[in-house]
């Protein structure tokens, strides 16, 4: 368990080791979250049947994590962090734009995840009754922050091992949850949930793509960059997709079965996604359930903290990686305290702000993945760190595509987390308005992806072919 001293540098050949299968654990650990059970209810909320929800969850999850897998290829081919490799697309200085947005998203979501773990602990222990809710939240907060800081600061080697244990513990405890609640599933009621039309299914599918895996694309190369360059590309993509997808798919499907069996549970989940799940449990299991809730959320927070530190370096802050992670961890700690104990009305607006940033990040993701797939060779190492090199200081084409994708994407999304975000959705009148059936399906994120994919392919493919000879 050694402190990692590598930062934005290309990993030396002598340090590259391991197999593609090692990617299973960090991605599984980041996605073994009880929130996936609640997502099953959200899928049914689109007005579709259980089987439609099942197919939407499987297809949406796999497609979104395929993008994460393709992004991981960049780390294997060039052995540098994601937001350093992004310089080849946006320019060494121009990359500060998507880099800074990614940094805000990382720090924001790690703060939200720790806050959710803290709040969930308090909610769960309210049912036990013998422990003060505030004390329970303090305990949950300390555990969540400690584990997140431990992994994020010490770095890659520790994360790869820690995520394995988090995955095994959380998966086993979640399996017990399924066993304890399986009698609550009424397959007659589940089968009776009416099917929705094609529009409703597509809306749920889009929700699956955007809500489960898409947000991890800008972290992917951070965890594959230690692999040898001769590692099978198919294996890198396959193990990433398998590790990230298998547990969320199972939990979403089971969550849909629970919600389809009891409409009141669906209503409760809408108000309290984690706390509502405790109503099905015996009291003796609640303490273990609290542990699952914390560990499941911490698995994602660890990856966010580690990647936020690397991204801070990638946008030009001249400090060591572990100091960057400590700095980000301090922001996370203070931010979580503020969200949980001070600002009662700030939590949802803050989430709304992060979701708003998700649209430009989606456009960036499409541009970056397209670039990775277009290139047959590794990125030029020296030019990634030289604004006068072949990648240049600023790629105006890529930045323009990102701006267009963001404008279109924001125009086709709704954000109800705060009144000051109501300006979004200014193009929804084209497809039925803010109250239409497409309004809450995140179709704007898909359009942002399409702009990124098509725009970069049309404007960069010929240049990349010429560049590679």
Regions found by a protein language model. Give the residues of each.
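C-terminal membrane-solvent junction of multi-pass transporters and transport-like membrane proteins
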Residues: 169, 365-454
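Membrane-water interface regions at transmembrane-helix termini and the short interhelical loops
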Residues: 45-46, 73, 89, 97, ...
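Transmembrane alpha-helical segments of multi-pass small-molecule transport proteins
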Residues: 99, 127-153, 168-179, 206-220, ...
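Selective recognition of specific alpha-helical transmembrane segments in multi-pass small-molecule
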Residues: 32-36, 59-67, 102-113, 169-181, ...
């Amino acid at each position: 368990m050694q402190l990692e001293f590598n930062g934005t540098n290309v990993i030396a050949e002598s340090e590259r080791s391991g197999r593609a299968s090692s990617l299973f654990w960090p991605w599984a650990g980041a996605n073994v979250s009880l929130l996936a059970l609640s997502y099953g209810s959200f899928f049914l909320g689109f007005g579709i049947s259980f089987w439609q929800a099942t197919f939407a969850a499987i297809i949406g999850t796999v497609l979104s994590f395929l993008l994460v897998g393709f992004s991981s290829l960049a780390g294997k081919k060039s052995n540098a962090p994601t937001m350093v490799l992004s310089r080849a697309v946006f320019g060494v200085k121009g990359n500060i734009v998507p880099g800074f947005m990614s940094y805000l998203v990382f720090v924001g979501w790690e703060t939200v995840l720790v806050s959710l773990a803290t709040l969930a602990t308090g909610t769960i222990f309210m049912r036990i009754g013998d422990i003060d809710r505030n004390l329970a939240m303090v305990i949950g907060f300390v555990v969540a922050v400690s584990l997140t800081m431990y992994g994020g600061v010490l770095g890659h080697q520790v994360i790869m091992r820690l995520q394995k244990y988090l995955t095994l513990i959380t998966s086993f405890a979640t399996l017990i949850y399924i066993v304890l609640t399986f009698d609550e599933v009424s397959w007659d009621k589940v089968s009776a949930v009416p099917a929705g039309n094609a529009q409703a299914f597509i809306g749920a599918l889009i929700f699956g793509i955007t809500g489960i895996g898409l947000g991890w694309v800008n972290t992917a190369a951070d965890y594959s960059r230690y692999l040898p360059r001769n590692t099978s590309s198919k294996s890198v993509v396959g193990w990433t997709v398998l590790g990230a997808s298998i547990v969320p798919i199972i939990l979403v499907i089971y969550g849909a079965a629970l919600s389809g069996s009891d409409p009141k549970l669906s209503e409760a989940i809408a108000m309290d996604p984690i706390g509502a799940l405790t109503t099905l449990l015996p009291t003796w299991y609640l303490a273990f359930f609290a542990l699952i809730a914390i560990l499941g959320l911490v698995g994602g927070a660890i990856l966010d903290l580690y990647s936020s530190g690397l991204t801070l370096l990638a946008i030009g802050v001249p400090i060591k990686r572990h100091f960057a992670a400590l700095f980000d961890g301090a922001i996370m700690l203070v931010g979580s305290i503020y969200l949980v104990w001070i600002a009662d009305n700030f939590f949802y607006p803050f989430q709304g702000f992060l979701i708003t940033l998700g649209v430009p990040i989606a456009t960036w993701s499409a541009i970056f993945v397209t670039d990775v797939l277009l290139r047959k060779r590794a990125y030029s190492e020296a030019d990634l760190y030289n604004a006068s090199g072949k990648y240049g200081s600023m790629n105006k084409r890529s930045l323009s595509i990102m701006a267009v994708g963001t404008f279109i994407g924001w125009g086709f999304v709704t954000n109800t987390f705060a009144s000051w975000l109501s300006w979004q959705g200014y193009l929804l009148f084209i497809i039925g308005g803010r109250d239409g059936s497409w309004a809450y399906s995140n179709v704007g994120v898909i359009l942002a992806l399409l702009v990124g994919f098509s725009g970069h392919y049309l404007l960069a493919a010929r240049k990349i072919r010429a560049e590679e000879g």
